[in-house]
């Protein structure tokens, strides 16, 4: 019934494309009129559009004319005319949707249409790419078109001076990576001066390779961190423990005897679990090594951090391997992106995992970090007023885009029909048989002059295959994280006749593989050769173009680009991206995946079923299964993994939404402090609130005198705020004083101290000082709060055993932590402002200038330097040094008072976090 309805009225995608084609007809009707304009008249259209928009015309009203102008500018600047399908994609992007366009269909050029249209509004457009190379390339390449039309472009990259970044964000169009946009948002919310902030309000973003950024990287939060406590020696000593423990042959099953061994590894969840025997052996080994006191348990609150160190050491030794998840380069452990195969320089695993891997590899162990600020890409990109994206493979993730980001996916038809042949998978029993078949396929293609792109899932596999090709004397290029610098060059040559290229995953996205080889790359090299005259350059360029034509015809005759996959990835989308390198713009091509029962995906998810089929068929050695049923079985396994990963990302978002709501509130308050001309009313309200709470702790409202603890109140005022107020004497002299009268006397004393300090140093200098103290208190307590949330999150799943909803419990306790943090910020600010000793206005100004000149964070791993006291002569007791977050706790009984001083029992306070 559903399929019949679709035939009658068309799918949602068909109906959208039908609407968009009506607009394309309007744009095409304007082409001849626009072509008649001079260059100056065409450029002047930008100001005309801006004026009309300011006078009330919507961007939708301007769309046909604006798109026609961009198409004409593209013809004049690049000699390239936007196809009608690119117009369809541009309309989809403007409408805040994801445009799925096949590889080679011109996504970069298509993006110029909505970018130009939305830049007319003057609020800034962000174009988000997956790496710095593409950001710079696209900013320079497409910037020529925007400059021709009178618009400015900027690019943001790591390590860029702050003034350049501010200028780049002020441009009409800003290019950059997802990481840099996210980090700049966090940096802006750590600044101490308004003029140092970089980003404007987040208006519109187009995300290139949207699936890579919004899905593959959604589980990885952006974190700015500073150094925490040094546990270097502990990581080294703990690394010696895993080899002394025995791995179980299989995971324990309910109602069955536990297999021999100390721990088992769950490859699906990427976790390691200790058995009962494993706990006992681990405690014995740690005691022998002097790490754990004799007779004590790893689950004692004092030693809970040791348990954490042991588990990360086990994970580092059993789940993380060199040349798969990471490489060792220049004495450092560098993460390899599992989706692109690129090195992720500057990224580090959290929770001590990176340090554990460094200990395993015997390289220098970097300090642990304390989170100063963090955000996930999911929450960062949802802050834009309008978001859209483009990719070659979004349809498999359309549900997630709709569910998480409220982004609809529109599949844009190709300009020319797709004629690539996707063959069924071939499944072998062993990896050796699989590699023999791959070698035979590569050799056959090489002899026929057909270029081959071989996709692998790890650096280790790419180098294994490279070794086999060397033995077979087959010339080839390897493109993995270790050859990252030559990426564009290798990909540009991958389409030459008989060329063999091995690439990890989808390294090289963003550069098309042109059949016959890339002419543009060779032309660029000739133009860059200063030893040649202009005439010689033109002659050589002419020869290159002439030589390319027969090479292109030869490759097409041989069948186009051949894609060989050596393993299936967890995600069908990554496999489709590999296939998508062939068959661009109507070119011929073919693809096939070669698999074995020893491949990780097959072993974990589909091995038993396929092995059963092979055994029933009694296939001889070296003979594969090749059937649609097997391919479908593998895709079912991939769907299971995708579903599990989607659940993980959705759960991450549900938990992060709690922190995100708190982040929004705190950053909004911080921005108010930063932007307000005077924060004196806010500070006075804080002082009044803190004083009221202090009085009510000792003298409850509407209470009788017998319930009052006046000496304790006097002591608290003197100890906390250095206010010496003899309330006992007042009560002796004025016996009729009520609790409200005492509160008023305390408030008068607090106001007197506060205004006295302002009078001493002057309004302007004091305003600078109290702003600085307020910002410092917010930053200090926010980073402590992030650590507390992290601890809470790690153990919250255990609430399920008590028949409680972990998410609801997390929300409730996170709110309590947040409320407590706001109270501590208030108390700290009031204490510093009331107890600080000042001597002169000049010293205040000098200290404020010193604070403003503090170095600002400039890297992925930040050390947010502690600011010096803003006033000379500040009493040492007025602001105690910030202590690092520590994992170790004193030994406390469950029913003892919590050592944090809250007055609660330990089990009801920090015992819950432990």
From Swiss-Prot:
Pfam families per UniProt: P-loop_SecA, SEC-C, SecA_DEAD, SecA_PP_bind, SecA_SW
Keywords: ATP-binding, Cell inner membrane, Cell membrane, Cytoplasm, Membrane, Metal-binding, Nucleotide-binding, Protein transport, Translocase, Translocation, Transport, Zinc
EC code(s) of this entry: 7.4.2.8
Gene3D superfamilies hit by this protein: Helical scaffold and wing domains of SecA, P-loop containing nucleotide triphosphate hydrolases, SecA, preprotein cross-linking domain
A GO term, aspect molecular function: ATP binding
Subcellular location: Cell inner membrane; Cytoplasm
Bilayer topology: Peripheral membrane protein
GO biological process: intracellular protein transmembrane transport; protein import; protein targeting; protein transport by the Sec complex
SMART domains hit by this protein: SecA_DEAD (SM00957), SecA_PP_bind (SM00958)
Cofactor note: May bind 1 zinc ion per subunit.
EC class: translocase
InterPro entries, per the entry: Helicase_ATP-bd (IPR014001), Helicase_C-like (IPR001650), P-loop_NTPase (IPR027417), SEC_C_motif (IPR004027), SecA (IPR000185), SecA_CS (IPR020937), SecA_DEAD (IPR011115), SecA_motor_DEAD (IPR014018)
Residues reported in the UniProt entry to bind Zn(2+): 898, 900, 909-910
Catalyses which reaction(s): ATP + H2O + cellular proteinSide 1 = ADP + phosphate + cellular proteinSide 2
HAMAP family: SecA
Family per similarity comment: Belongs to the SecA family.
Record's function text: Part of the Sec protein translocase complex. Interacts with the SecYEG preprotein conducting channel. Has a central role in coupling the hydrolysis of ATP to the transfer of proteins into and across the cell membrane, serving both as a receptor for the preprotein-SecB complex and as an ATP-driven molecular motor driving the stepwise translocation of polypeptide chains across the membrane.
Protein name (record): Protein translocase subunit SecA
Origin organism lineage: Bacteria, Pseudomonadati, Pseudomonadota, Betaproteobacteria, Burkholderiales
